[in-house]
């Protein structure tokens, strides 16, 4: 009889999606960049595992990387200095018409968000003086000269809202088409996404609550012309078991709905940031 742990391993291999082999080798240069950030940014590392995540995505200095929805630049502050002067980084944002769809932003806020796209190179310049090439554009305004130049496109906690407005405006389709256009032949897409359990009702997986199912994301990328290369549990959090009405923003760092309730806040803080899938895809013909 085979040992139980071997049988378990065989069963998992049969049931699970392709998983990356664990490789504890992380570029010391990447670790140095991560360590050099301010303490507020580093406080999130225990949940976001940037060194392991970027290593899993096989990112290295000199690459051209497009970051979808860079926001305040949490990952930009790592990528820009790490890619270095021989690399390039692009910040790719929602199309201008997407912002009003959220329904809760004032006109001034919408204008600020739209303007932030063009300010991405300035953000990069504030992070590093290496002279790295930087550009900011939207999913529907990819510069033709950048087509086929990217080694990686990253969707880090970015796909839920793109899926949320897919039926209304084709936002996910547009974003993945932009990714495919940007990538070199054989280039890869890295995904980190809040994960809804596979046995949860589908109503919670439209993106409006922040969560998507892993099978749903894989199908979405495959339909757009990518193949799954590997999956990882780097960013998994088994403590996060969302109920039918739970939103991802109930958890840190947002803590929506509990900031004035110490007990609820403590409970959400104890869970930590969300359970997340980490997936790597390759562009295929």
Residue ranges with predicted function:
Residues 26-56, 60:
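Class I SAM-dependent methyltransferase Rossmann-like catalytic core
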Residues 62-71:
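Conserved class I S-adenosyl-L-methionine
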Residues 83-84, 163, 183-185:
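Helix-to-beta-strand junctions that scaffold the AdoMet/dcAdoMet cofactor pocket
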Residues 105-142:
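S-adenosyl-L-methionine
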Residues 143-154:
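A short acidic, Gly/Pro-enriched loop at the edge of an enzyme's catalytic core
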Residues 169-185:
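A short glycine-rich, Lys/Arg-flanked "PGG" loop and its adjoining helix->strand segment in the class I
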Residues 186-194:
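Conserved beta-strand signature within the Rossmann-like core of class I S-adenosyl-L-methionine
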Residues 224, 264-285:
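C-terminal lobe and adjacent flexible extensions of AdoMet/dcAdoMet transferase-like proteins
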């Amino acid at each position: 009889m085979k040992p139980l742990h071997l049988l378990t391993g065989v069963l998992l291999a049969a049931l699970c999606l392709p998983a990356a082999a664990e490789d504890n080798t992380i570029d010391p240069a990447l670790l140095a960049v991560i360590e050099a950030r301010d303490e507020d940014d580093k406080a999130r590392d225990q949940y976001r595992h940037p060194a392991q995540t970027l290593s899993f995505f096989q990112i290295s200095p000199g690459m051209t990387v497009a970051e979808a929805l860079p926001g305040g630049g949490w990952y930009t502050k790592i990528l820009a200095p790490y890619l270095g002067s021989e690399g390039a980084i692009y910040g790719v944002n929602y199309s201008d018409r997407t912002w009003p769809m959220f329904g809760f932003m004032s006109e001034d806020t919408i204008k600020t968000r739209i303007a932030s796209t063009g300010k991405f190179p300035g953000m990069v310049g504030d992070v590093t003086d290496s002279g790295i090439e930087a550009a900011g554009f939207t999913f529907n305004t990819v510069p033709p000269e950048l087509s086929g130049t990217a080694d990686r496109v990253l969707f880090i906690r970015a796909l839920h809202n793109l899926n949320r407005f897919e039926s209304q405006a084709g936002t996910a389709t547009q974003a993945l088409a932009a990714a495919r256009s940007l990538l070199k032949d054989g280039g890869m897409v890295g995904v980190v996404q809040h994960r809804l359990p596979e046995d949860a009702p589908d109503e919670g997986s439209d993106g409006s609550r922040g969560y998507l199912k892993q099978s749903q994301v894989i199908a979405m990328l495959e339909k757009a012309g990518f193949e799954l290369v590997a999956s990882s549990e780097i960013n998994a959090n088994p403590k996060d078991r969302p109920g039918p009405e739970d939103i991802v923003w109930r958890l840190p760092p947002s803590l929506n709905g509990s900031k004035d309730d110490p007990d609820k806040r403590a409970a959400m803080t104890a869970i930590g940031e969300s359970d997340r899938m980490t997936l790597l895809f390759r562009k295929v013909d």
